[in-house]
Amino acid sequence: MTEQSSKSHPSFMSTEYSLPVFSSQYSDIENKDVLKSNSWDPYAANAPIALSEIPSSSKSGKTNGSKAAVESGLASGAFGNRTGNMNRNTSMSGYTFGSSNFVPYNLLSNTPSFTTSHSSSTTFVPPATMGGGLNNLSSPSSSLYLPGSASYQRSNSKNSSASILQMNTTLDDIPILLRRPGLSSYTPGPSTSRRSISSSSNLGGNPGLIANNPSASKNFAFTSGSSSTNNSTTSSSSMANGLQSISKHSAAFPLLSNATSFFGENLTPSLAASTASTGSTDSSGSNIANTLIAPTPTISPPSANTVGNPSPADTPGFNVPSLISDDPSVSSSLSSSVASLSLQNSNILSFCKDQHGCRYLQRLLEKKNQSHIDAVFAETHPYLAVLMVDAFGNYLCQKLFEHASEAQRSTFIQIIAPKLVPISFNMHGTRALQKIIDLVSSPDQISCIVNALRPNVVLLTKDLNGNHVIQKCLNKFSQEDCQFIFDAICEDPLDVSTHRHGCCVVQRCFDHASPAQIEQLVEHIVPHALTLVQDAFGNYVLQYVLELNNPNHTEAIISYFLYKVRALSTQKFSSNVMEKCIFFAPAAIKEKLISELMDEKHLPKLLRDSFANYVIQTALDNASVKQRAELVERIKPLIPSIKNTPCGRRILSKLERRHPSSKEKPIVYSNSERVNTSSSA
């Protein structure tokens, strides 16, 4: 016995070898510890361990081989199957269970392959049925069975996953799964976790019990196993009841709500429910009263009419849709298969919301096969409004609308029209809707969108996500089609213009407006000029109007500021507008504005003000020659009092550059003054 085998090891079916659950409820250290759990030591027990009765992990962690009396069983793991008694094969190709084998799936093959079945004295493992699929995972060495409605949960954990689509198993998990042969599927549990599989402890009170193959109810005939241990009379009955319960809720993944597969024949994206039923086969209580019965799969050779892969009716297992071939002959056959099938109820919705399922359907649509497009549209159109706001589903909606026909696009828009406003508010929905607006072309489609958005334009303009939808309409629709936006803003211009997002929409309105629409906006905005100029966001709207450099608009705005220039120049937001007024104002009005700033009583205060000094600088740059000279003469006497202030230094710097004659050596920073100042200090 090696030193390693003498150490304490948990039972290979204990919860310590279940798939680790990565959850926010666990710390990073705890998650890492899950990955660092000891590798399974097949030599920890002298006697072989039967699959029929395996005790839960004890304090020592060792399994009790003496109590394992049932000779055989079958367990389905997430990445391979095992049968019979378990020993470790020295090769890296797999595990040996008594006279049977556990062979990991070949996850690196790009094309389906079919391997010889591995059999033992008591059980038979069917060949693989896995297509190219979502991640090009293909060719398992033995069938994979996953229950659609059953959850995968870690024992004694509150976290579970109600759908295999939420499992998110990646290639990083494969080494962990291969060293944890105690994986199998059980009855449903609460749905909270994103990733979980475990050895459950709620079947017949035996935490080590390996569940019946989930697909047995559809494809397997039950056979009697060997005699059980001393207490098998009482425990086997309850365990058998557990198996029966599983078979009622089990089928090949993924399943519809009625327990039928929605991956279609030929391993193509069936977008469709399989017509085969997954009802329970004969497994009466009399057959399993005193023994743990292992399912024996029955398998038929692949049908001759299949394209590259056997149909689900031929081979039980987990059918992942393979990628559509570029070969026209193959594509035509596949498309006919896809078109004849249909998805139902919530399973297609879950599939579209899944990252990998969504990507698969997008790749399917990119093939531009009209049969595939029609099938996807037919099955997803009842859920378009829901998918539009989903983190992954919105990408499918964008791709579907891109490849849909004009009739389908019109139907698409009519379906989502009642929910267009809440879709616009959503961070995912706004992107999908903007893509749709980019692609719409017919007047009916545009009219449908306009009518859906019209009642809530103001709310949309002020929303973080909704304002982008309005801006996209302005950018893509004609000026006539966008008139509803201008009308809505003009009803309450102050509310929109003083909003963080609304002010941006108003500026885009000016960018895309016709001359008549610009006049309409200015007519409704200018009366609120005095309020807007002092607002943190409204001042940008006024600046945008002034930058249009229309004398009529500029005069209309400045008329509200005359005799208030000094007060507005000392405010943070309005001072920016005062600078624009001086810059764009006609000569006569510009002179009036600067005259207010030159008042000898208020000029010293303006020169020292942190905002007004910028307005004075703009006045020096834009005043007429006569008015500039007058302003400089009024500033000169104030130089000694402002020279040491930050604002005053900026004014003096501008005077030195533009008006060297105003420089006074004793006052401005001359070399002699710097020497005198340093010596006095």
Curated annotation (Swiss-Prot):
Keyword annotations of the record: Repeat
Keyword Nucleotide-binding belongs to the record: no
Top-level taxon of origin: Eukaryota
Chain positions covered by the region annotation Disordered: 180-210, 273-322, 656-681
One Pfam family it belongs to: PUF
Gene3D superfamilies: Leucine-rich Repeat Variant
Residue spans of biased composition, Basic and acidic residues class: 656-666
One GO-annotated biological process of the protein: nuclear-transcribed mRNA catabolic process, deadenylation-dependent decay
Taxonomic lineage from the root: Eukaryota, Fungi, Dikarya, Ascomycota, Taphrinomycotina
Organism for this UniProt entry: Schizosaccharomyces pombe (strain 972 / ATCC 24843) (Fission yeast)
Name this protein carries in UniProt: Pumilio domain-containing protein C6G9.14
Molecular-function GO terms, alphabetical: mRNA binding
Sequence ranges assigned to domain PUM-HD in this UniProt record: 319-659
Disulfide bridge map: none
